[in-house]
Amino acid sequence: MDDCIFCRIVSGQIPSSRVYETDQVLAFDDIHPMAPVHVIVIPKIHIPTLMDLGDERMKELDALIVAVQEVAKVKKIDQKGFRTVINCKEEGGQVIFHLHLHVLGGEKLRDDLN
C-alpha cells in the first residue's frame, strides 16, 4: 500500500534502522522510543490489524513471535526481560494500520498503561 508508512519502510522508500529481517518480517528501531530499547516488528505483507489475521495468516504471527525473540537477543534484553505490545484499532491505541508489535526494554518498565 503506497499510503502505508510501514509498507514504504519495507520497500526501502523510507529509511529505517533495521535490527532484524527475514523474508516475512522486518524489525527496526522506533524513531520515537518510549524506552531505552524500542523496536517495531512488522510483517512484510500489509495486514491492517490483529483482527485481520485469519487462519491463512498464522504463519505471519509465528514469524513475528520468532522475530521478537531474535530482537530481544540482538538488543541484549532477553535475559532481564522486556515487554511486547500490540495495539489493535483506534480504541486500542493503534495509530498506524499495519499490524506491528512493539518490543520495549532496557530498563524496569512501569506497570501503568498510560
Each predicted region: which residue ranges?
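HIT superfamily nucleotide-processing domains
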Residues: 1-114
